[in-house]
Amino acid sequence: MSYGLLFLRVVVGLVFFAHGAQKLLGWWGGPGIAGTKELLGQIGFRTPGALAPIVALSEASGLLLAAGFLTPFAALVLAAAMVVAIGSVHWRKGFWNMGQGYEFNLVLLSVPIAITATGPGRFSVDRAIGWDDNLSGPIWGVAVLTLALVGALFVLVVLRARREAATA
């Protein structure tokens, strides 16, 4: 099982990191921090300048997931980022990824939660320093999902202008 968890952590963690690097540094054709700020403003966030580096760094924390280091923290940040992405961009476009729906984001949301619930595996930093037994399990998975939903709801409700105002 540890080999499967290692593979899953590394692949999904690097996918998250790549998206964060696009937003933060403009790598791989990404918008960079200025473009991320502009995008956040276009979709109705009130403080896009403050949120842009937070959004980019939250996705770049996929490196923590890939390494299996501070796994619940990485899962919380990544899951919250995906809930915000679903709520602010993808939900209204339907389920299927082909139409920019939330299908892909839902998968990305579920993997860090599942890894927290099962533990990062034998080949992880958390295991190497003896934290994995204390920072994983079903209760941790539920706690991370709950906190991610609450945090994302705060961002979507408090930090985002009403939709009518954003499109006016």
What are the language-model segments listed below?
Residues 1-27, 49, 71-168:
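Extended, low-polarity transmembrane helix blocks
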Residues 21-33, 57-61:
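Hydrophobic, membrane-facing alpha-helical anchors
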Residues 26-51:
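Membrane-interface interhelical connector segments
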Residues 34, 38, 55, 68, ...:
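Internal, well-ordered alpha-helical scaffold/interface segments
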Residues 44, 68-70:
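Helix-loop interface residues and adjacent transmembrane-helix termini in multi-pass membrane transporters
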Residues 50-58:
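Short hydrophobic alpha-helical membrane-embedded segments
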Residues 57-66, 89:
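Hydrophobic, membrane-inserted alpha-helices
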